[in-house]
Amino acid sequence: MSFIRESGLEYPIVMSTHLTCIAIFGGLIVITDLRLLGWAFQDKSIADVVNGLRWWKRVGFIIMFAMGFTLFGSKAADYYPNPYFWVKMLCLVLILIHAIIFRPLVYNHPENLDASPVIPTRAKVAGALSLILWTAVLCNGRLIGYYEPPQQKGHVVAAAGTK
């Protein structure tokens, strides 16, 4: 995929698409998580928010992931030594674990959360962890571009017979 990096137009298009999807997907995640925490959109049921945004979040995630994978492929050698890249990857693994744990407990049946007079703790934990992890992904993803590997100090060896 190095042709993307070397092209005049493809790389900016892929990067712009990735960033646009981050903004859209991220906004939908924030809306969902704030509702799970009970901090916003209290005039809407949790089920309406979760179910209403589900399709859009999936589409945004798929495009965002595809563009991110394409970006990685175009500069894999640059990303490999980058600690921010690895922290981002770790956070994405933690998000996958979050999804595996909380999908059956919270996201698959959000109408059960509305039946309770108080938002269940499991929903609040899911929302809080999601906000923290996605924020960490976003921040570390942003920092990837600013990382500069340490420069190796060159050794100057004096030629024999010189002072």
Locations of regions flagged by a protein language model:
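Polytopic transmembrane helical bundles with strong interfacial aromatic enrichment
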Residues: 1-163
